[in-house]
Amino acid sequence: MSLMLEPNPTQIKEERIYAEMGLTDEEFAMVERILGRLPNYTETGLFSVMWSEHCSYKNSKPVLRKFPTTGERVLQGPGEGAGIVDIGDNQAVVFKMESHNHPSAIEPYQGAATGVGGIIRDVFSMGARPVALLNSLRFGELQSPRVKYLFEEVVAGIAGYGNCIGIPTVGGEVQFDPCYEGNPLVNAMCVGLINHEDIKKGQAHGAGNTVMYVGASTGRDGIHGATFASEELSESSEAKRPAVQVGDPFMEKLLIEACLELIQSDALVGIQDMGAAGLTSSSAEMASKAGMGIEMYLDDVPQRETGMTPYEMMLSESQERMLIVVKKGREQEIVDLFEKYGLAAVTMGKVTEDKMLRLFHKGEKVAEVPADALAEEAPIYHKPSKEAAYFAEFQAMKMETPKVENYKEALFALLQQPTIASKEWVYDQYDYQVRTSTVVTPGSDAAVVRVRGTEKGLAMTTDCNSRYIYLDPEMGGKIAVAEAARNIVCSGGEPLAITDCLNFGNPEKPEIFWQIEKSVDGMSEACRTLQTPVIGGNVSMYNERSGEAVYPTPTVGMVGLVHDLKHVTTQEFKQAGDLVYVIGETKAEFGGSELQKMIHGKIFGQSPSIDLDVELKRQKQVLEAIQAGLVQSAHDVAEGGLAVAISESAIGAKGLGATVKLDGEATAALFAESQSRFVITVKRENKEAFEKAVEAIQVGEVTSTNEVTIHNEENEVLLTANVDEMRKAWKGAIPCLLK
C-alpha cells in the first residue's frame, strides 16, 4: 500500500482498521490517550506489533512474574536478548530458547530455518560466540502425509541453516501426538560463551550518538509476523505465507563474525537483533531501556524492494539484521569493519533525550510516539482462569494397570513408538561435530560441549512431557524441570539455570489460562528447589487449529556445568561384569505413559507424581558419585519405564547386554513412568563405595551375551530380548514410518 493509499487517522478509527492489525477497541482508545490524538497508519502499526502478545506478553506477564530469576551465578536475567550465567574463570554461558511455531506450520522449511537464525542473533547480540544449538519439536502422528511433510521440512530447515552457519546442533527432542497435527511446535535454543567484560546490552545511551543499521537489506517478508504469531491458525492462515521470513545462513555467519569483532571496539554503545517486529521493536526497546529517544530517517534503510512505505519498513521481519548505537564521530570505523565482511552498515538516525521514537521519510515526520509507550506500556491483562473440566474427572479416576499379555512384544512395540524410537534420522542431518568441541553427541541424556582452553564442559538438554502437563499442569511443570536437571546430572553436569518456551493454546480461554498458571506454578517450585533460576525465555500462545489446542507444552532448556571433562558420563553400558543399580522406587504410575497411549490410544488419569526434595537429594548423590569416579554409565528413567531405559543403555553399547531382577508387579516394574529414577552401572570394585554414597538397589549386572533378560522376584523370566534385534527395531521405526 503506497503512502497515498493509506487510510487517514479518522478512517482508521471509524472503519476499525486497527482491529485488522490486532488491536482491541480498548487498546486503540489507550493509544489515542497516550498520543493525545488519533494515530496515523504507521503509528497504529507500531502499536499493533509492540502490543501483540508475542512482543508484550500482555496476557502472560502476571504469570511470568512467578518465576525465580535471580541466583548467585546469574549475571543477566530476563529482559535482554538472552540470559547469562557465570561459569567461573571470568567466563559465562549465554542461552535462550524461542519458538517459531506459526511460521513453521505454514512454511516449514523457512519457518524452522529462520527460527534458528533468530535465536542465534539473540545470543551473539549479547557479545557471545554461539557454540551449540538444540531444538525441541512436536508433531502430529507420522501416519499423516501432512505431518510427514512438516516433519521432513522442519528438520531440513534446521539442518540447512545450522550446518551452513557452522554451529553444531547437538541435542533436543522430538515428540509425536495427535494434538500437534495442525499446529506443530518448533522451539530452537542457542548456547554461547562470553568473557564477562564483553557483555553487551541492547540499550541506546548517549544523546547525539549514532543509530546504525547493519546486515541484510529490508524486504516485505515477515510484515506482521508478530501479530500472526498472536492468533490461532485457521484455514486462511495458508494465505499468510508472505508473513514467513526467508533466511540466509551465509549472511548470518558474516554478521556473527562482524558483530563479535565490533563488540571488541569501544565505539559500540548498544546492539540488538531485529527480531519480531523488526526495526520497531529494536529501536523502541533500545531507547526505552536506556530512558532515551531515537530519531530515524527511513530513506536510509537499505531496501531490496521498491516503493516500501514507512509502515512496511518498520514492520518487516527480514532476517539477518541488527540495530546498533555507536559513539558519534566513529561511524566510518564501523562502516569499514562491516565492509570487510561484505556487509552494509548505514547511519540512519541518532539518540535523543526526549524519550520519543520519531520517524522521518521523504522529508516528512511520519511517526512520533513515546518509546516507553511501545516497549513498556502495553496493557497487562489478568485473564480469567478456570480449572479444566477434564481435570477433576482424571483426578477421581481409579487407575488400573494396563493389561500386557507378552512383555517382550510390549517392549519391542514401545521401542518403536516414534517418541521413544531413535532420532538418528533427525540428527544425522545435523552437523553436530563442527567446531570440534562436541564431547557428547546427540542420543544420550544431555549433550556436552567443551569450553576450549579449560577442563570444563557445558551440558545441555531440552525437556517437556506435555502429556503429563495436560493431565496435571502443576505436577507436569515440576516434572519438566526435574527431568531436565536429571539429564544434566546423568551427563556429569551441575544444573545451572533454565530458559523456557511456553507453548499453549488461546489464553483468552479460561481453561487454557488455568493450564498456563498451574504449569508455571509447578515449574517455579521446581526451579526454586533445584536452584535453577529462569534467565529468559519466550511465550507462544494461540497454538490452536480450528479451535483445538495443543497440549500445554512449557519446554525447558537447561544448561549445566561439567567442572571437569573427566566427569562426563553417558547412558550406554561400558563393560561386562559392571553392576546395574536402580535409584528410586517404582509405583504403578501409567497416566500419560507411552504404554497407556499405545494400549488405549489415548491418555487419561493422574500423571506420575514427584517429590522435589527427594529428586534433589538423589540428583546430588548421583552427581557426587559421578564426580568421585564411581559411575560407569547413568541414564534417567523416562518414557517407557525401566525396561526401555535398560534396553537403551544396552542398545548404545556394542555387544553388551544385562541380566536384571525387578521386584513388584511385572507391568509396573517394566513400564511404569515413576519419576526421580536412574539406571546406573558401577565397576564391581566400586560396589562398597558407591552403596555408601548413594541410596540405590543393585538389580543385576552387565553381561557380554548381547541380550537383556529381566526376571521377577521369583526369578521367573519376564522377557529376554536380543540387543541387535532391539536396536534394529528402535533405529528403524521412524525411517519406516516415513517411507
Swiss-Prot record:
List of residues binding Mg(2+) 1: E98, N538
Subcellular locations according to the entry: Cytoplasm
Pathway: Purine metabolism; IMP biosynthesis via de novo pathway; 5-amino-1-(5-phospho-D-ribosyl)imidazole from N(2)-formyl-N(1)-(5-phospho-D-ribosyl)glycinamide: step 1/2
Binding-site positions, substrate: S99, H100, N101, H102, R121, Q245, E317, S318, Q319, S540
Residues given in the record as ATP binding sites: Y57, K96, D500, G537
InterPro entries listed in its UniProt record: PRibForGlyAmidine_synth_PurL, PurL_linker, PurM-like_C_dom, PurM-like_C_sf, PurM-like_N, PurM-like_N_sf
Residues that hold Mg(2+) 2 according to the record: D122, D273
GO process terms (BP): 'de novo' IMP biosynthetic process
Top EC class, one word: ligase
Keywords, sorted A to Z: ATP-binding, Cytoplasm, Ligase, Magnesium, Metal-binding, Nucleotide-binding, Purine biosynthesis
Active site residues according to the UniProt entry: H54, H100
Entry GO MF terms: ATP binding; magnesium ion binding; phosphoribosylformylglycinamidine synthase activity
Main location: cytoplasm
Top-rank taxon: Bacteria
EC number: 6.3.5.3
Reaction(s) this enzyme catalyzes, per UniProt: N(2)-formyl-N(1)-(5-phospho-beta-D-ribosyl)glycinamide + L-glutamine + ATP + H2O = 2-formamido-N(1)-(5-O-phospho-beta-D-ribosyl)acetamidine + L-glutamate + ADP + phosphate + H(+)
UniProt xrefs under Pfam families: AIRS, AIRS_C, FGAR-AT_linker
Annotated Gene Ontology cellular component terms: cytoplasm
Function: Part of the phosphoribosylformylglycinamidine synthase complex involved in the purines biosynthetic pathway. Catalyzes the ATP-dependent conversion of formylglycinamide ribonucleotide (FGAR) and glutamine to yield formylglycinamidine ribonucleotide (FGAM) and glutamate. The FGAM synthase complex is composed of three subunits. PurQ produces an ammonia molecule by converting glutamine to glutamate. PurL transfers the ammonia molecule to FGAR to form FGAM in an ATP-dependent manner.
Family: Belongs to the FGAMS family.
Assembly and oligomerization: Monomer. Part of the FGAM synthase complex composed of 1 PurL, 1 PurQ and 2 PurS subunits.
Name of the protein in its database record: Phosphoribosylformylglycinamidine synthase subunit PurL
UniProt lineage: Bacteria, Bacillati, Bacillota, Bacilli, Bacillales
